[in-house]
């Protein structure tokens, strides 16, 4: 294992923290500050907690109410414009002229390619089986990426309604999905 004395850093944000960790590890190796680095990240979007006002940590909640905020909505919101990242996807599609059909086609191709790679066992040596405890039954073994849907069709995608703007182009089928997962790499000079 990795000795306890090994220096570490943690990046705590909703998305791309794993990629940032890999970039930092690469910089450490490139500058000679490290010969070997372990980098990675996790996403646990299905278990994001509800949040209370930050001041409650230090001041408590004395004789008053506090509003619970959905941590997932907070994480998927733009802190500058205060709207969901799905609206950002709509804005980007509009700005760069990406049609609904193009988005659906990319989603379809992505699902098909991923499903084919899974069925051919291309990820078998990259995914570690995880046992997920159940309340009243044996643990479920997760050993495959659950995001790709092999039954995705262009017809099915085209029938989905926009979810972020009334006349928008981003749907539950062509938007980024909400996932749980983790990845780790060992990097060396």
Predicted regions mapped to residue ranges:
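Short, well-ordered secondary-structure micro-motifs
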Residues: 21, 49-50, 140-144
């Amino acid at each position: 294992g990795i000795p306890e004395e090994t220096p570490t850093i943690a990046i705590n944000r909703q998305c791309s923290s794993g990629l940032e960790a890999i970039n930092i590890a690469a910089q450490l190796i490139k500058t000679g500050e490290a010969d070997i680095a372990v980098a990675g990240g996790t996403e646990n979007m299905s278990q994001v907690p509800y949040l209370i006002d930050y001041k409650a940590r230090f001041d408590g909640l004395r004789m008053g109410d506090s509003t619970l905020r959905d941590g997932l909505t907070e994480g998927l919101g733009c802190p500058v414009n205060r709207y969901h990242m799905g609206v950002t996807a709509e804005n980007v599609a509009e700005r760069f002229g990406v049609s609904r059909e193009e988005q659906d086609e990319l989603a379809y191709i992505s699902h098909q390619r991923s499903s084919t790679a899974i069925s051919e066992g291309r990820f078998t040596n990259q995914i570690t089986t995880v046992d997920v405890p159940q309340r009243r039954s044996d643990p479920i073994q997760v050993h495959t990426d659950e995001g790709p849907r092999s039954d995705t069709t262009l017809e099915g995608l085209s029938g989905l309604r926009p979810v972020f703007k009334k006349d928008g182009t981003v749907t539950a089928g062509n938007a980024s999905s909400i996932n749980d997962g983790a990845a780790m790499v060992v990097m060396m000079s």
